[in-house]
């Protein structure tokens, strides 16, 4: 094991560091902090992973944040229970680790900082002074692993109920309900749970009154149509003005990351559909791509085109629901019924291809489940002829309506700097004028072969600009679908790799080893080599990604699912303070989120 503990903070004694632009960020880190205090882990993630001692964490964060091309977005932050990991001989000694995934927009590159921790010292300094969006990520890391972040503004549970015992993502916390005592909700327990839901303003630094006014505290949700799911926001009100608010999440949590530790690499695919239940196949894509990296599996060209086609169909489907419900939130009912008619056409096409509608579980490691059926092209062409006219109808009848424009333009504004501070991705970020679409910047599944534009805003993201970005994205998705229709290649729809595809009858009858391998993989699942991989995609609501750790087994050792909706909801208080309740309703409609995506 490697000791990263510096004997003294030698980097603090150096003069102001002059960055070498010809050096990689790794070498700049090594030059400044000393190579002996940094360990570079080689993985299949596609970006450098640097282990450092926790005493250097804040300084390393500041160093990366203040580079000439800075790592300006904290993309993700979470933990790993390292205690029973078998293949970590060359890594620093650790019972737990916390990783900090940072993105540099100017470099179009990522870096991950990992901090090893021992079980008797699970304490780290908070990152919130540098990145405000670290707040919720640190709360979730404490919630799931019990790692403490010193000087955190309010280190309380965020996903699990406040009455919960234990930290679910620890390896000694069972994933099976059968290993626990039967659960009974008697009157005493019910009272305890209800007390746990009671909001206490003082715990959040809120005053009940000031010299002139006594504030009202109002629960919006968790069962309110404008909350778009099981989501509660506690509002501190002065009349109808929002003084402050506290989003409360976790009601839709299903333990998706824990489930991945007890499912085979194949059998976890259906769970990915339900992370963001409107995205369908889009959610499957980052997972199967990450597993394919681990297994070094190449995907046939036809499978890549089919994956893109299905992803864009689900993108349009999700955007139609978003646009129509946004219009409904502002006060117009008719478009939502028209949108469901249009979405039915998409579902008919999806069902014809996959056999299912919302949750097909159709992508496979190495390809897709089946070849395209006869007549798929006719259904797709009919939809491509239909949709542009309908989209024009939405724009002319609703989105150009003066009342809607007045209710949404200039409401819930933020700029590019604020968006990056809070980890905003997708249409919300692009509305600020930043052209960052993973399909263009970091192409996957052959997106580099398609011609399409990335819609961007004029500099300020408000409710109206966010919805209009999504409208234009539908046009671009239709253009991509037309290219899929005209250029669908022939050939196989899945890889012939033995990890993904059963062998042919000829091979089975001629080679006993082939039959044995097939039996083991069908019975227990394929064994994926030990390593780490990462894949991000441009999902329907922003950037979605899977960070996978394989320990050389038939199941994932750690599956981290980073969803866009989680940071988008964390941003709400900073945007909506000082606004009216009616503005909050429009703002919530403009974010585009579902709670399954937030809570996982």
From Swiss-Prot:
GO cellular component, one term: plasma membrane
Pfam families, sorted: Complex1_30kDa, Complex1_49kDa
EC code: 7.1.1.-
GO molecular function: NAD binding; NADH dehydrogenase (ubiquinone) activity; NADH:ubiquinone reductase (non-electrogenic) activity; quinone binding
Record keyword Magnesium present: no
Subcellular location(s) per record: Cell membrane
Membrane topology: Peripheral membrane protein
Keywords: Cell membrane, Membrane, Multifunctional enzyme, NAD, Quinone, Translocase, Transport, Ubiquinone
Catalyzed reactions per annotation: a quinone + NADH + 5 H(+)(in) = a quinol + NAD(+) + 4 H(+)(out)
Domain of life: Bacteria
Region described as NADH dehydrogenase I subunit C: spans on this chain: 1-190
Region (NADH dehydrogenase I subunit D) residue spans: 214-600
Main function: NDH-1 shuttles electrons from NADH, via FMN and iron-sulfur (Fe-S) centers, to quinones in the respiratory chain. The immediate electron acceptor for the enzyme in this species is believed to be ubiquinone. Couples the redox reaction to proton translocation (for every two electrons transferred, four hydrogen ions are translocated across the cytoplasmic membrane), and thus conserves the redox energy in a proton gradient.
Subunit relationships: NDH-1 is composed of 13 different subunits. Subunits NuoB, CD, E, F, and G constitute the peripheral sector of the complex.
Name of this protein: NADH-quinone oxidoreductase subunit C/D
Species assigned in the record: Buchnera aphidicola subsp. Acyrthosiphon pisum (strain 5A)
């Amino acid at each position: 094991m490697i000791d990263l503990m510096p004997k003294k903070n030698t980097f603090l004694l150096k003069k102001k560091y002059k960055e070498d632009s010809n050096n990689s960020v790794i070498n700049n880190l090594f030059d400044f902090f000393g190579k002996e205090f940094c360990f570079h882990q080689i993985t299949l993630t596609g970006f450098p992973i640097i282990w450092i001692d926790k005493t250097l964490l804040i300084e390393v964060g500041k160093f990366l944040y203040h580079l000439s091309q800075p790592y300006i977005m904290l993309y993700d932050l979470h933990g790993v229970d390292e205690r029973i990991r078998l293949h970590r001989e060359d890594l620093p000694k650790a019972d737990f680790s916390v990783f900090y995934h940072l993105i540099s927009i100017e470099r179009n590159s990522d870096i991950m900082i990992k901090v090893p921790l021992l079980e008797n010292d699970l304490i780290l300094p908070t990152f919130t002074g540098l990145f405000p969006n670290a707040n919720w990520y640190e709360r979730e890391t404490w919630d799931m692993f019990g790692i403490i972040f010193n000087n955190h503004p309010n280190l309380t549970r965020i996903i699990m109920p406040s009455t919960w015992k234990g930290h679910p993502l620890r390896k000694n916390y069972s994933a099976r309900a059968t290993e626990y005592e039967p659960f009974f909700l008697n009157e005493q327990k019910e009272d305890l749970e209800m007390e746990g839901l009671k909001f206490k303003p003082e715990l959040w630094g809120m005053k009940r009154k000031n010299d002139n006014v006594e504030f009202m505290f109002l629960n919006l949700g968790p069962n309110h149509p404008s909350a778009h799911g099981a989501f509660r926001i506690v509002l501190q009100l002065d009349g109808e003005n929002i003084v402050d608010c506290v989003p409360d999440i976790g009601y839709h949590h299903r333990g998706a990351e824990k489930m991945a530790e007890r499912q085979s690499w194949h059998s976890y695919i259906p769970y990915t559909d339900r992370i963001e239940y409107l995205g369908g196949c889009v959610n499957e894509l980052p997972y199967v791509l990450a597993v394919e990296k681990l297994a070094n599996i190449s995907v046939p060209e036809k499978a890549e085109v089919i994956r893109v086609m299905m992803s864009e169909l689900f993108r349009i489907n999700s955007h139609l629901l978003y646009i129509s419900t946004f219009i409904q939130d502002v006060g117009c009912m008719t478009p939502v019924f028209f949108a469901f008619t249009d979405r039915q056409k998409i579902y008919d096409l999806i069902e014809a291809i996959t056999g299912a509608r919302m949750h097909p579980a159709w992508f496979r490691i190495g390809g897709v489940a089946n070849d395209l059926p006869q007549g798929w092209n006719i259904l797709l062409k009919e939809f491509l002829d239909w949709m542009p006219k309908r989209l024009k109808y939405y724009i002319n009848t609703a989105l150009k309506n003066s009342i809607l424009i007045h209710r949404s333009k200039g409401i819930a504004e933020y700029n590019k700097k604020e968006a990056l501070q809070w980890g905003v991705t997708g249409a919300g970020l692009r509305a600020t004028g930043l052209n960052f679409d993973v399909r263009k910047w970091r192409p996957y599944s052959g997106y580099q072969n398609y011609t399409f534009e990335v819609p961007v805003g004029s500099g300020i993201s408000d409710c109206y600009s966010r919805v209009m970005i999504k409208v234009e994205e539908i046009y671009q998705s239709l253009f991509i679908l037309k290219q899929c229709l005209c250029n669908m290649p022939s050939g196989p729809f899945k890889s012939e790799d033995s990890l993904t595809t059963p062998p042919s009858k000829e091979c089975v009858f001629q080679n006993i080893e082939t039959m044995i391998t097939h039996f083991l993989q069908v019975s227990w699942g394929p064994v994926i080599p030990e390593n780490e991989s990462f894949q991000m995609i441009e999902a329907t609501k922003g950037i979605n990604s899977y960070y996978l750790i394989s320990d050389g087994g038939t199941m994932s050792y750690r599956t981290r699912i980073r969803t866009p909706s989680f940071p988008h909801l964390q941003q709400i208080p900073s945007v909506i303070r000082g606004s009216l309740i009616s503005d909050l309703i429009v703002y919530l409609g403009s974010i585009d989120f579902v709670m399954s995506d937030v809570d996982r």
